[in-house]
């Protein structure tokens, strides 16, 4: 009896131990041969002899399709914290990141403001926000941030709970939540990554990510799905707070301010629209079944968690609601993202909280707080927002909601239209650089301005300086690649673009430019990079045209595809409303090769009728006559 029982125990032990030993052996072998990628949020890198924590470019592969990675604003956190350092980490999604221009987000303003309030400290504010993530992702980020020796975590989170990873409105994940969580856990190991790669199908098939259009799944206010979302959010937020406390960090939770007054329901049907008409804006937001904004219950949970854990609360939602009606300028660009004034308000609320916690009286504002925000930057922000507001989910809003058309007069007014205006913008950038010479963000914005106006010679020394200041930023390598692409040194241009892609695999501009540079010498690689760029940013006209050109006239016949070239050229024309001469030339050429003159004539005739601009009309008419 005893020996039989002992034998059974041995068999059970072997049954349990064998797979574990096998897994450890496989995992060890894969790591030994450098298969797969680390799953942590940060990696350790050395630049100029100093060790830093930098973003892991593969971190979000557990939460998003591999072809559409998400990345934070590039950062490099010194492993050795300054003795007099005041280190702040900002955690959250796109609103926390400062989208659409993180260089003017509240993290940047917070750093300037804190530097003015604590002149005796070495102030560091690191923006760890990532577009499209939610608390399921931030929970893992927070766990990894425990080693970063921060004094404060600012957690601004809650807009993407329904649409982000594991959310019920996420089309790729909502019906498979538990399976995806298991997959997510497996992907933290190299063995799990190997299994995923082996089981993946159509890995090279282009994926068209459309942004917010992908998440138009109505979720009702009283639905079981939303109740689960709120329960998950509470659990994740408590986990984030626990990670912060374990690291000895002061965690500052903020409620989430959203646009209530000028963002009508995104799905304007039934009770939501009735509440909007009755000017009960908060209720209209809660009843809006397209859940792209944090609702009132989400903010209640944030307040409750802060209270239960004895944390200091930044009640941004209430402060915005109080101040917005009297604000001298808009606080929101769209449904949740801030204007410069909105970002400034959030930053000031955080500073107010930190000063209160440290029992310090506020000092007068710094004399040089500038971030170098110019007319050129404002124009660029409005152009981005016009593009976004022209697409779902904003298309169904009532006429008094957000509107792309309303931005057009401002965009036209801000467009640099004279030498004097350009010189004034240039001077403002140079003054900002002089005030903050070690700031890579200002310098990169200035480089963007110079390259936009084809001033590559003037841009090159600033590109070199930006590379010295922030070699971990893919934008610095992309800018240098762009400058060198127009010179006699395409090899070095390609090297910088490849460096940018290593740092951030989702840097679509580098993929697009590299694809264009490789079209003659290595068309197969060119095709791969152009498809990668298009998967990440399907509306990029330059990529559409480059890919159409390659498919139309590749020096290898097997890479030619006239049907696809026609489709790509047509997309480029449609995106530019048939006003881009290069797109029209390529469209006409693709028409001839694909024998689709009748279809093209109809498209051009429609465009002629739609435009009121005489020059555009003449250009379209000439294209039509030359078919």
Predicted regions and their residues:
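Histidine-centered active-site loop/cap adjacent to the catalytic His
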Residues: 14, 228-233, 331-362
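Serine-dependent acyl-ester chemistry module
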Residues: 104, 158-304, 308, 316-329, ...
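Helix-start (N-cap) detector for alpha-helical repeat units in TPR-like alpha-solenoids
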Residues: 440-441, 474-475, 508-509, 541-542, ...
């Amino acid at each position: 009896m005893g020996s039989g029982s002992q034998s059974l125990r041995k068999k059970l032990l072997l049954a349990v131990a064998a797979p574990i030993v096998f897994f450890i052996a496989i995992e060890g072998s894969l790591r030994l041969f450098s298969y797969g990628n680390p799953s942590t949020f940060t990696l350790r890198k050395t630049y100029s002899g100093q060790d830093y924590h930098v973003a892991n470019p593969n971190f979000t592969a557990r939460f998003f399709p591999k072809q559409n990675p998400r990345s934070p604003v590039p950062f490099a956190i010194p492993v050795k914290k300054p003795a007099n350092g005041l280190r702040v980490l900002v955690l959250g999604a796109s609103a926390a990141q400062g989208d659409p221009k993180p260089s003017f987000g509240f993290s940047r303003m917070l750093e300037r403001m804190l530097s003015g309030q604590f002149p005796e400290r070495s102030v560091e504010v690191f923006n760890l926000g990532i577009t499209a993530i939610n608390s399921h992702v931030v929970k893992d980020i927070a766990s990894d941030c425990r080693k970063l020796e921060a004094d404060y975590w600012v957690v601004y989170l809650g807009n993407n709970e329904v649409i982000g990873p594991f959310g019920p409105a996420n089309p790729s994940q909502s019906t498979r939540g538990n399976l995806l969580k298991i997959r997510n856990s497996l992907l933290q190991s190299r063995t799990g990554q190997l299994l995923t790669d082996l089981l993946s199908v159509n890995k090279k098939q282009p994926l068209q990510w459309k942004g917010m259009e992908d998440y138009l799944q109505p979720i009702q206010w009283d639905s079981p799905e939303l109740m689960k979302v709120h329960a998950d959010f509470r659990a994740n937020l408590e986990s984030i707070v626990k990670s912060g406390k374990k690291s000895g960090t002061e965690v500052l939770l903020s409620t989430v301010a959203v646009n209530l007054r000028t963002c009508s329901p995104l799905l304007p049907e039934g009770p939501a629209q009735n509440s909007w008409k009755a000017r009960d804006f908060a209720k209209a937001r809660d009843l809006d079944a397209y859940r792209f904004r944090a609702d009132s219950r989400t903010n209640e949970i944030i307040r409750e968690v802060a209270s239960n854990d004895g944390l200091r609360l930044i009640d941004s939602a209430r402060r915005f609601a109080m101040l917005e009606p009297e604000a001298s300028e808009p606080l929101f660009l769209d449904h949740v993202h801030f204007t410069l004034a909105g970002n400034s308000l959030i930053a000031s609320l955080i500073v107010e909280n930190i000063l209160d916690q440290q029992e310090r009286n506020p000092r007068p504002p710094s004399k040089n707080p500038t971030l170098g925000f110019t007319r050129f930057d404002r124009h660029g922000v409005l152009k981005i927002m016009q593009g976004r507001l022209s697409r779902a989910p904003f298309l169904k809003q009532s006429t008094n909601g957000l509107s792309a058309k309303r931005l057009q007069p401002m965009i036209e007014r801000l467009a640099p239209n004279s030498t004097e205006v350009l010189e004034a913008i240039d001077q403002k950038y140079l003054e900002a650089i002089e005030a903050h010479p070690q700031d890579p963000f200002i310098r990169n914005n200035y480089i963007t301005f110079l390259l936009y106006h084809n001033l590559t010679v003037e841009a090159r020394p600033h590109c070199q300086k930006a590379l010295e200041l922030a070699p971990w930023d893919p934008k610095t390598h992309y800018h240098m690649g762009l400058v060198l692409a127009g010179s006699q040194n395409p090899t070095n241009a390609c090297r910088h673009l490849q460096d940018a892609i290593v740092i951030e695999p989702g840097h679509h501009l580098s993929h697009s430019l590299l694809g264009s540079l490789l079209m003659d010498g290595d068309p197969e690689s060119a095709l791969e990079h152009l498809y990668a760029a298009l998967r990440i940013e399907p509306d990029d006209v330059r990529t559409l045209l480059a890919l159409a050109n390659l498919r139309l006239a590749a020096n290898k016949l097997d890479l030619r595809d006239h049907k696809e070239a026609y489709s790509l050229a047509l997309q480029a024309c449609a995106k530019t409303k048939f006003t881009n001469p290069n797109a029209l030339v390529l469209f006409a050429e693709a028409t001839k090769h694909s024998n689709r003159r009748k279809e093209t004539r109809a498209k051009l005739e429609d465009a002629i009728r739609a435009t009121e601009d005489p020059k555009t009309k003449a250009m379209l008419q000439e294209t039509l006559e030359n078919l």
